[in-house]
């Protein structure tokens, strides 16, 4: 029984420590968010699907900077014009430490974070005006580590686009689900070498 309790304590300590190892200076974050996805179930129902691949480098512990690409397609109902959305820009993330005031770690297997982005994006509507503008967004999220290097993420984010043309500010609040792979620098170099060979 003592061995079982000791093994449990070691496992819990190891899992708690893995929530910090991923977000250290020099590591890489690669992942994607499924921005929104819905399909109309009624006759003539529409759909909205978007994906956001992203990559970032930890410039210091708990702080990552990188870039993203936004791609999406939207059709409100059958017969309505199809809308294609796109964007590219920079992003930043700050992971909250469990010791910071007001921060509690859910099950000790993940981390809360704040994410912000700025870039250029737009939309192209079938047989209608298209626009390009300044994309921006910010919001809190949580990364739950299912393994030491893979996190499932949820993010509530305010997203806005200030059009450069006749279109003004468009904004909404999105709920994002996705995943991220956290690679130590040595592992990232191995992957890059494997791709070259």
What is the meaning of each model-derived region?
Residues 57-136:
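Gram-negative (and chloroplast) outer-membrane scaffold detector with strong preference
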Residues 88-97, 170-197:
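Outer-membrane beta-barrel "beta-signal"
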Residues 39-49, 76-83, 125-133, 163-170:
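Solvent-exposed loop/turn segments connecting transmembrane beta-strands
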Residues 1-25:
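Bacterial Sec-dependent N-terminal signal peptides
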Residues 51-57, 69-71, 90-94, 118-120, ...:
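Residues on the lipid-exposed face of transmembrane beta-strands in outer-membrane beta-barrel proteins
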Residues 37, 72-74, 119-123, 159-163, ...:
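Structural signature of outer-membrane beta-barrel domains
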């Amino acid at each position: 029984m003592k061995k079982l309790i000791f093994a449990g304590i070691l496992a819990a300590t190891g899992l708690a420590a893995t929530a910090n190892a991923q977000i250290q200076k020099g590591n890489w974050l690669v992942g994607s968010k499924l921005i929104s996805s819905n399909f109309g179930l009624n006759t003539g129902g529409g759909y909205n699907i978007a994906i956001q691949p992203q990559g970032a480098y930890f410039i210091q512990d708990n702080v990552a900077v990188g870039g993203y690409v936004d791609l999406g397609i939207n059709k409100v109902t059958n017969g309505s014009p199809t809308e294609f959305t796109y964007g590219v820009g920079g992003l930043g993330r700050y992971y909250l430490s469990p010791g910071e005031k007001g921060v509690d770690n859910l099950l000790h297997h993940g981390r809360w974070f704040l994410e912000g982005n700025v870039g250029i994006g737009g939309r192209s509507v079938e047989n209608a005006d298209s626009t390009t503008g300044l994309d921006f967004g910010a919001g809190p999220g949580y990364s739950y580590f299912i393994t030491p290097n893979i996190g499932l993420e949820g993010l509530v984010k305010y997203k806005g686009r200030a059009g450069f043309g006749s279109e003004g500010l468009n904004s909404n609040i999105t709920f994002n689900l996705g995943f991220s792979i956290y690679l130590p620098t040595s592992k990232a170099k191995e992957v890059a070498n494997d791709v070259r060979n």
